[in-house]
Amino acid sequence: LLLTSKVKVENMSGTEENEPLAKKPKTDESSDANTHVYTNLELVPRFTGPKLEDMTEEQREIRDTILANRPGTGLTGPFGPWLSVPEIARTSEMLGRAVRYGTSLSRRESELVILLTGRKSRCGTEVDVHVGEGLKAGLTMNIISAIPKFDTFSTAALEELVIPLLENEREKAIARYTAELLDNYTVCDETYQSTKAALGDKDSVLVEITSIIGYYTYGAYMLNAFRIPSKK
């Protein structure tokens, strides 16, 4: 992901543009927050959802619920477009809270899964948002920068670039399971059983990981289709 002069960034519209070099991450984690190149800040959105004055009473109620449950981020990301279909907005918000805050995974583990999903889904906006969340949760920029982009994403690339940087066998198992499911749309028996063993022999934890992958793939498709820009 790191080049010697410039890094080529492919945006959501399919065009490419040259961005300044992202400096090689230092071992000093205090500099981590300054090393990510935001790729989708200038996107012109296709649709950001209904305007407040045009919302129905049901949409306003759902909007208020989203704002109450997401005081720091509000209607950013896919939530605006979702509001155009109230039942989808309501259900998506509830599922999002469940997979983000209602699982047995640590925040660091969850953010690792989300960032892998965003990279594989070619969603710069999702990655831009969750780089900051991942750093807060304890991931380093070295780990985040090592995650392969969509066109080079594979279980082999993850094994070479990311796995050596992870802290423990539990994280490595989660990353391997996530990468294989994203890359192959299924996982082999060996991966399933080894991941289950690393996670306390609980199938339910694999349900949680798979649900996070599914939800953030869904979110990535929304962000990509409607060209929702990033925010720093």
Language-model features: locations:
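Hydrophobic alpha-helical segments
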Residues: 7-8, 13-232
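N-terminal export/membrane-targeting signals
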Residues: 1-4
